[in-house]
């Protein structure tokens, strides 16, 4: 089992640090085949969150939990994530930006906790 938390990072630092953590655990746990999928989905998801934030003071806490054959990544924001939830929930090539559709296709499961401004993203890894 692997657990790591990035605490309250500004948004741009969150992207860099997230990719570093993903690279490290993929290397450590021999998940190189999953690196591209996870890193692309998380990079695009974090960019989507940044682009849809209400102010320049966006901070994110990101918790990584690798257990058995699943990687769960919890993203907690200091701002509401309400504006990206509908886009991700209804992702399709017809009604969304192509990047949103790609994010949704790469992630195995995504859930929202609007009350706590959290997203839980899950990837099945082998």
Name what the model sees in each region:
Residues 32-59, 105:
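Conserved ATP-binding N-box helix of the HATPase_c
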Residues 15, 82-84, 119:
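Intrinsically disordered, low-complexity acidic/polar segments
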Residues 52-62, 70, 116:
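G2-box/ATP-lid motif of Bergerat-fold
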């Amino acid at each position: 089992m692997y657990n790591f938390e990035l605490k309250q990072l500004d948004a741009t630092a969150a992207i860099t640090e997230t990719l570093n953590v993903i690279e490290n655990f993929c290397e450590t746990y021999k998940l190189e085949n999953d690196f591209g999928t996870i890193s692309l989905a998380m990079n695009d998801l974090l960019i989507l969150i940044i682009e849809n934030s209400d102010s320049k003071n966006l901070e994110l806490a990101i918790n990584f939990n690798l257990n058995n054959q699943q990687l769960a990544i919890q993203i907690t924001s200091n701002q509401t994530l309400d504006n990206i939830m509908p886009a991700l929930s209804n992702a399709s090539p017809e009604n969304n930006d192509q990047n949103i559709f790609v994010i949704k296709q790469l992630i195995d499961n995504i859930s929202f906790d609007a009350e706590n401004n959290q997203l839980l993203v899950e990837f099945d890894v082998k």
